Swiss-Prot record:
KW ATP-binding (keyword) present: yes
Keywords: Acetylation, ATP-binding, Ligase, Nucleotide-binding
Family that this chain belongs to: Belongs to the ATP-dependent AMP-binding enzyme family.
Gene3D superfamilies: 3.30.300.30, N-terminal domain of ligase-like
E.C. no: 6.2.1.36
Induction details: By autotrophic growth conditions.
Top-level class of the enzyme under EC nomenclature: ligase
Reactions catalysed, as given in the entry: 3-hydroxypropanoate + ATP + CoA = 3-hydroxypropanoyl-CoA + AMP + diphosphate
Residues at the active site: D526
Subunit structure: Homotetramer.
Protein name, as recorded: 3-hydroxypropionyl-coenzyme A synthetase
UniProt-listed PANTHER family: ACETYL-COENZYME A SYNTHETASE (PTHR24095:SF232)
Amino acid sequence: MFMRYIMVEEQTLKTGSQELEEKADYNMRYYAHLMKLSKEKPAEFWGSLAQDLLDWYEPWKETMRQEDPMTRWFIGGKINASYNAVDRHLNGPRKFKAAVIWESELGERKIVTYQDMFYEVNRWANALRSLGVGKGDRVTIYMPLTPEGIAAMLASARIGAIHSVIFAGFGSQAIADRVEDAKAKVVITADAYPRRGKVVELKKTVDEALNSLGERSPVQHVLVYRRMKTDVNMKEGRDVFFDEVGKYRYVEPERMDSNDPLFILYTSGTTGKPKGIMHSTGGYLTGTAVMLLWSYGLSQENDVLFNTSDIGWIVGHSYITYSPLIMGRTVVIYESAPDYPYPDKWAEIIERYRATTFGTSATALRYFMKYGDEYVKNHDLSSIRIIVTNGEVLNYSPWKWGLEVLGGGKVFMSHQWWQTETGAPNLGYLPGIIYMPMKSGPASGFPLPGNFVEVLDENGNPSAPRVRGYLVMRPPFPPNMMMGMWNDNGERLKKTYFSKFGSLYYPGDFAMVDEDGYIWVLGRADETLKIAAHRIGAGEVESAITSHPSVAEAAVIGVPDSVKGEEVHAFVVLKQGYAPSSELAKDIQSHVRKVMGPIVSPQIHFVDKLPKTRSGKVMRRVIKAVMMGSSAGDLTTIEDEASMDEIKKAVEELKKELKTS
């Protein structure tokens, strides 16, 4: 059975301006107008935006076509992503404007103008051409977060190749799987890069991956960027250094069909091999550019985006590489973890470059909060207008901290919902064009124009207000939606996303709609706890726990129980100033029972840190494996291995308690 849902510490906050508040009614009516237009005339709605924001070699013959099950956009149009991101800015004042600003944990800094980026993209494109890469070939990119990684992506797009970026934290098996599936002709990598005081050897990992494939390896060449100038093994005839072949020569951009694939980005499935999500060229560029202006709020020429994501994820594709450069903005990137070498490194970067939008993950915000307020107060963060979070559910406590401490009560907190598959935000707010009243915690806001998102019950009917249901999206899907899956005839696509509700896209998330129309995404449906016939999302319990004033972070798992079905265990990280104790554990437990009812009474385990991926997602499967005494599986993406020791220690203490009780 599903529970009726009352959110913890729910608030509807004003926009912070009396003048804007007086316009609130108009703002919501304008939002309703945009939604109505995008629903009744989707071709006209998206077509006008594509014409206004992008440069096309040839106009499309058909704006939209609904197929089974995806929507095709701008059919017959000719375009090039690299030209739109770089070349078209060189005949005006953006030529010498900063396109990318980069820092490393070693203190290195680099400002890359649009003119510089044009030069670098052509160098990389020329290098790829010299290695035999052409239109339709796949190029795997395994690079740290540097301007060179961005240039390599744009160079692939320039010559019509399809890039497949792999996050630099992945291990050799993940690389081997993706390279083999994509049949990559060339792998672009770096010798090594610094991460939390250590040297991460990328070329060595690529060698291990290709060696494991043996004769199955499709790779003809490995192109190596000398990031740290370390000694690496170079296989004769296959491996080549970028500085030896990356000579500047103008490369004419390939005229691509709007529905030619721009990239493949692999996302892990719950079972089986990773899914190669394919995005088109014209549609993807249109949708991401629109949401950069509207949802990320970079609507002004001099706006600056500091994004803590990575090019190995969809956020880094959409809101580091493509849309900021498509729209001629400045994006700031930091190669290492945003809290290294000191906790307020991220705040220092915001202050130094006067970022106007700060993009980060919900998990990272919780992590920053753990260090306390003083680190933030040491910096002038007044340039920030908008804080954008995505990834995991944003609980109330970090939402409030971001608004009041980081933003001084004057920023717009825009928690978005979207996926690798959808390419750009689908739920959220529109701070770039209108201010809408914010709701706290995991409220993702409203369906964004052109995105027809609903919450349905098990039978496919609209869920009642505050009753949890399933998040779905109706066609026509926005242009930034995936075009399909690599190496798939459509069967896996339909089975994965369209088997539960027919023609409706089902991403696998729980959600609810409140009485005001706000949609709250409650977490993955496959992370459900089954307690005495009740199905409760792990994210719901985590939200209740983190609403306790002492808690910075929490991860919840279920362990089989012969009586209740599952017993809830919570691993809790405390804020500075609080110490673990049995009394505090009981107080947190009582708080959760009060918020969620007596049916939910989690066992509390205190830890100093939670195991997370380098993208900031909590590795709940790893925690559960330790609890169950089973193998933790692949740990190559873990951010801090010491977090595993924390979990093991907590489990051992639990076992001792059980023996003595």
